Amino acid sequence: NPPAVARIKYQAFYAAEKISQVDTPKTKKESWMDRLAGTQPADENAKPLFQLGEPYGMAVDSKGNLYVADQKVGAIFVFNTATREVELIKNKVHGHFVRIIGLAMDDNDRLFVSDPGLRHVLTFNAKHEPEDVITEGLVSPGGLALDVENRLLYVADIDQDQVLVYEADSLKLLRRIGTTGQNHALTTPGDFARPAGIAVDADGNLYVADTLNNRIEIFDGDGKFIRTFGKAGDGPGYFSRPKGVAIDSDDHIWVVDGMQDRVQVFNQDAQLLISFGGHGLLPGMFQGIAGITIDKTNRVFTSEIFPGRVQQFLYVTDAQADQLNKEKEAAREKKAGASNKDSSPAVPPSPLTQASAPTPK
């Protein structure tokens, strides 16, 4: 049989080592001594280089552009994944940032940005212009997720051990999930100890990476607890500080395991399907993995703090894999049939054929 189709394919990485986005103030004309000493740039219009420092939360807009929140640089990188061009949503230019962590994008390309340093969530329109600020109920907002169909914004509050639910248009606080005030000590199902990444599936169910409890908790769209899975450990299917969670179009649950620098993929029955990663800088390995997001085309993006990079993978869906396997099998059978035909011995003519053949003159 032909080998099965690879279900997760590495595609690219983003680091922006040579991106230049911020103008430097013009200085006096440099002398030959300045050039020799290296005290001034050779070009008055030269700009400093920027690269990802500590990328965390990510989001993808309707055009396929990738947004990456960088808490060290204090900016949001906007990568055109087709042309590899980069823009920045900058601190003190487009908005005021202290420590940006979480990102989420709605169907109108409105961007939500969590900043625990300022205890709020900012919103930007599609032109990257600031619009609104959410402060109600927030102490240390981190992970963000949007239920676009039901118009709900979920905000994981790390210090309060809660997930806050807002109406996505009016930005009104609707309810809280979890118990607060216990200093990250609660282990009961439905409560959290430093919740980090969150995600919403197609049915409106909420998934929460409960970091200190080393588990994933699942709630329905009304905030009612459904189930939990995961235990502390470093073996397959176990967690060591899960930080991020995402859902693909087949409803598989992708979990970023912080201390193990790996990604584990589960089905809805919490059965482990695949695990990949490990400590390292090679493609498909991670150093300080922090976040994960999956877009509508099943591109998977992971962020890493220590090398300052984002890696891009492609998840091949169940339907796509079935079709590709059928095509592979058909090609194999066609090749085998042609091979058998070429290798079959020549059939001698029958006596009837010999008798009816014209006699050469």
Which functions belong to the PLM regions below?
Residues 1-361:
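Eukaryotic scaffold repeat domains enriched in small/polar residues
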